[in-house]
């Protein structure tokens, strides 16, 4: 993969933005936008809210973001959305999240592979993509860069994509704004400055020149004979789950779940609670786990959350299934599960109340 130019061109904040209202009053050349990102894209009065304000038709901005997740969650949201607008530009905003997952021992190869799949799916559907690269406060105030970001930059360069870089925008047009005012906390930008609005305007302007990911050579070969599927359990009756962001079926984790799958297991999606068991995946080819399906029980925290588990690594390739795959809860006694970033583990009491969450589905790579 060729080296990236680490200085992508950021839209000027002077004449181009002064012309913003004039250019967009009629909506001419302004595409529909689908935002797929992390918690910064969900903040009230954050950059994604401002994007709806500056777009000439706010109804053409769809926000599919989920906090504390990675491109794997973006794939779930994209693949299961039944109401995508025509000919959208997909705004990918998972760099900050994935940098944090990388810092908590999630391999870059896993994160980048899922991001490549995200770009591959967009390319197959003819969707244009505009990455929006955000940074933690600790990164903005440091000369050192998280290693994951080098891999991400090379990935975007290989696909011919030019990201909007929030750090470059800050240094170019908001150099007067100290880091402590730019951020509300380490992973979240403040909504009390003009920066979110400026970022939104830059994203809107660059969305007009966004391109479909270009995959040639090795990238084309890498995915040419593969497809990606969301696989749901085919045993037991699901329970409905609805909140302000998501409506789906979930399958409680207290007993075995069966999946009809011939392929490779990459990840799973679940509604996690404070009382879920550890879970294991197994087929006739092997086993993965156990993994904690719990979230933190801290006071004031959420009771249930949409989460994902990333189920492979370079040293431990995806579990292969040849028709049948099972998820099984593990006994509480003696179980010390793997606890991934943003998850938690507190051993369950025997005979205790069952969890209120459940599995949604699996992310699997299959042969086309």
Cite the ranges covered by each PLM segment.
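Histidine-bearing beta->alpha loop at or near hydrolase active sites
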Residues: 65-70, 186
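Generic detector of low-complexity/intrinsically disordered segments
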Residues: 179, 221, 230, 248, ...
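Short beta-strands within extracellular/lumenal beta-sheet-rich domains
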Residues: 240-261, 274-280, 307-310, 357-358
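Alpha-helical cap/lid subdomain in secreted, periplasmic
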Residues: 53-57, 73-212, 272-282, 287-367
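Serine-esterase "nucleophile elbow" of acetyl-processing enzymes
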Residues: 2-67, 77-86, 258-261, 267-282, ...
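Short, flexible loop segments at the rims of nucleotide/cofactor-binding pockets, characterized by
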Residues: 10-12, 67-69, 108, 140-141
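Secondary-structure junction/capping motif
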Residues: 46-53, 70, 165, 225-234, ...
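Charge-rich interaction segments
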Residues: 190-194, 201-253
């Amino acid at each position: 993969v060729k080296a990236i130019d680490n200085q992508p061109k950021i839209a000027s904040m002077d004449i181009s933005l002064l012309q913003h209202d004039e250019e967009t009053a009629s909506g001419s050349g302004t595409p529909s936008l689908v935002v797929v990102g992390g918690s910064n894209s969900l903040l009230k009065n954050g950059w994604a809210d401002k994007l709806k304000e500056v777009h000439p038709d706010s109804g053409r901005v769809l926000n599919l973001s989920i906090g504390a997740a990675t491109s794997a969650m973006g794939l779930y949201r994209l693949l299961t959305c039944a109401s995508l607008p025509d000919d959208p530009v997909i705004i990918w905003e998972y760099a900050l999240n994935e940098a944090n997952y990388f810092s908590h021992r999630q391999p870059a190869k896993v994160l980048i592979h899922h991001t490549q799949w995200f770009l591959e799916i967009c390319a197959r559907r003819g969707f244009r993509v505009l990455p929006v690269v955000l940074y933690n406060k600790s990164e903005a105030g440091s000369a050192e860069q998280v290693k994951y970001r080098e891999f991400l930059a090379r990935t975007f360069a290989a696909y011919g994509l030019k990201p909007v870089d929030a750090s470059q925008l800050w240094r170019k047009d908001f150099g007067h704004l100290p880091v402590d005012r730019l951020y509300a906390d380490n992973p979240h930008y403040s909504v009390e400055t003009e920066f979110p609005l400026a970022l939104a305007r830059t994203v809107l302007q660059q969305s007009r020149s966004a391109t479909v990911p270009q995959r040639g050579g090795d990238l084309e070969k890498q995915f040419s004979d593969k497809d990606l599927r969301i696989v749901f359990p085919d045993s037991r009756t699901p329970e409905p789950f609805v909140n302000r962001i998501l409506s789906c079926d979930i399958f409680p984790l207290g007993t075995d779940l069966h999946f009809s799958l011939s392929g490779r297991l990459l990840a799973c999606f679940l509604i996690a609670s404070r009382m879920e068991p550890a879970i294991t995946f197994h087929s006739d080819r092997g086993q993965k786990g156990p993994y904690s399906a719990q979230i933190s029980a801290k006071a004031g925290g959420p009771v249930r959350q949409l989460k994902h588990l990333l189920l492979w690594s370079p040293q431990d390739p995806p579990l292969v299934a040849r028709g049948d795959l099972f998820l099984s809860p593990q006994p509480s006694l003696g179980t010390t599960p793997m606890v991934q970033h943003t998850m938690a583990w507190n051993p369950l009491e025997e005979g205790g109340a069952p969890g209120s969450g459940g599995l949604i589905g699996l992310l699997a790579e299959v042969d086309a």
